[in-house]
Amino acid sequence: MNSNLSAILSLHAELSLVLILLVALLADLFAGPLRRRWFHPAVCVLMALQIGLNLTPDTRALFGGMYVNTPFTSIVKSILSAGTLLIFLQSGEWLGRKDTHYKQGEFYVLTLATLLGMFFMVSAGHFLIFYIGLEMASIPMACLVALDKYRHHSAEAGAKFILSTMFSSALLLYGLSFIYGTSGTLYFADLPAMLQGSALQQFALVLFLAGMGFNCLLYTSPSPRDRQKSR
């Protein structure tokens, strides 16, 4: 019983983030117009507490080594949480406008869901968990890009993001299938001993890196405004 409890507590970063996400979701559903003015500072305070919770050192591998928690991963998660808190602080004025005031809950929930996916990517000890975390981060991020769906620029950017994410996922999974086929493992710790530098493994690495590059949008794409200027 104690071992199970300690294993669950090793997920304190993810569990605390899920708790903040649920609080933001329920507050958006049930909070009245007068109480919404406390929405922004409350979420920022909860995120600040979550950053401090991430700094608690813990070293443990869960789910057969597929999830790994170390002091280094805790530091990286704290940096990601601090970046998210900075985004929330900078977005206060934008969310306070009349045309975006009603989108506060959606913005917080989608941003926190993206951060949750990044947490799983950081603690991944297996390519499967890494891919699941990548998709958990990409799908809410696509919704964030198209948050202002009635504006042409936002809708087009969301469509581009979804298409590029689909293409990158196909490349990444194709690369992972070659990695597993040539090495027989998807665990990060076991993979270096299985790599032989064959042409097929090099091709698999190229596919994986290409998929990651497309998912990170490491390429240029002209916006509608740029195309109008070029004309």
Language-model regions: role of each:
Residues 219-231:
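Single conserved hydrophobic/aromatic residue that forms the stacking wall/gate
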Residues 1-221:
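Alpha-helical transmembrane segments of multi-pass membrane proteins predominantly involved
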